[in-house]
């Protein structure tokens, strides 16, 4: 399996708690049919942030 590279989110929506955060679509290997799983990761100034209280 080839795990896709990290890339900008296509439709990131927004991050209510940190409006200036950057969205990245991050994929990692996983034990499923695709061989990987992906998630939206929000970061601000190099730190991962939560977008919802």
From Swiss-Prot:
One of its GO terms (biological process) is negative regulation of endopeptidase activity. GO terms for molecular function: metal ion binding; metalloendopeptidase inhibitor activity. Signal peptide: none annotated. Disulfide bonds join 9-23, 15-51, 27-38. The keyword Zinc applies. Keywords: Disulfide bond, Metal-binding, Metalloenzyme inhibitor, Metalloprotease inhibitor, Protease inhibitor, Zinc. Zn(2+) binds at residue 53. Metallocarboxypeptidase inhibitor. Has an inhibitory effect on bovine CPA1 and porcine CPB1. Does not inhibit D.melanogaster svr (carboxypeptidase D). Shows no activity against serine proteases subtilisin or bovine trypsin, cysteine protease papain, and aspartyl protease porcine pepsin. This is Metallocarboxypeptidase inhibitor b. It comes from Nerita versicolor.
């Amino acid at each position: 399996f080839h795990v896709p590279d990290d890339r900008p989110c296509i439709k990131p929506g927004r991050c209510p708690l940190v409006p200036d955060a950057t969205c990245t679509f991050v994929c990692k290997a996983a034990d499923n049919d695709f061989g990987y799983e992906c998630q939206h990761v929000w970061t601000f100034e190099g730190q991962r942030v939560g977008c919802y209280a």
